[in-house]
């Protein structure tokens, strides 16, 4: 650790040269006192010795103080950088953030349960129909996509309930699958008996007012996250919960039916798989671009196709459980893949040279 910086060394040099200059003036003062009275030589010598000792002590204390001051400054600067790096490391990876379903508010507005899910807890603005939202499956809280992406880039908890949204190493986003015979949703990760879900958790306030979070009509996707039962208050400066524990958090909770939840997760996987489509390759001319339109037009058409697929998939009719199966989701993925391939112009391998007769 470098202690002697340029400014600090200049300060120490000035502190050393000033007492030395005073030492040079001390003999002249003692000589003037000795010329006035020759009988006081002994007392003048004692006073000069005392003055030298005092100046030496003062110089020593000054040097020690300067050294300690420089060390404290270096430690504070180093500690500040360590705290900053530790806060940066607490964020969630971009891949995990993108695994949370994103959609437009107008696409799920007609399917939500209750009057909740109408406001973002980060910017405190109501949702508009054409605004992109991001839904948190562990706690069903919904935020603007830009707001929650910025929040999770430096934090790993939900802004409302402080649920841990970071996945452990080796875990993946829980993708529910449908059983053809029973029609029940099966999660990819088994829930342990000691895990507690957000459903039915209660909060007790200091003023003897009990607030119980509304019981969700759906089980949700709560397999890989641990949601605390009690919402402990934290200050806004620490970057944790922005909502007081006794406030009504229904307006931040978007409760959706199980079928809609499964469709959102499936369509989010489809959208992520079609972000970067492979290009057809020729052995003679290498990679080729899309055959229909330019790159920007292809991405625009693919996004429109995906949006139509989302709207179509969410416009389902609630039927008994045995009727629904995984065939609907597989057909949807196949149709969306074919539509995107057609819009992007990335067809299967074809001959680039005409056949010779």
From Swiss-Prot:
For this protein, the Enzyme Commission number is 2.3.2.27
- Record key words, sorted: Membrane, Metal-binding, Phosphoprotein, Signal, Transferase, Transmembrane, Transmembrane helix, Ubl conjugation pathway, Zinc, Zinc-finger
EC class: transferase
- According to the record, the segments passing through the membrane are 47-67
Ranges annotated as RING-type zinc finger = 120-162
Q: What is this protein called?
A: Putative RING-H2 finger protein ATL37
According to the UniProt record, list the residues that bear Phosphoserine: 273
Q: Does the keyword Zinc apply?
A: yes
Q: Do you know which Pfam families this protein is assigned to? A: zf-RING_2
Q: Where is the composition biased (Polar residues)?
A: 198-210, 283-304
Q: How does it sit in the membrane?
A: Single-pass membrane protein
Q: Which PROSITE patterns match?
A: ZF_RING_2
SUPFAM superfamilies per record: RING/U-box (SSF57850)
Recorded catalytic activity of this chain's protein: S-ubiquitinyl-[E2 ubiquitin-conjugating enzyme]-L-cysteine + [acceptor protein]-L-lysine = [E2 ubiquitin-conjugating enzyme]-L-cysteine + N(6)-ubiquitinyl-[acceptor protein]-L-lysine
Classification lineage: Eukaryota, Viridiplantae, Streptophyta, Embryophyta, Tracheophyta
Q: Where is this region: Disordered?
A: 172-210, 281-304, 327-357
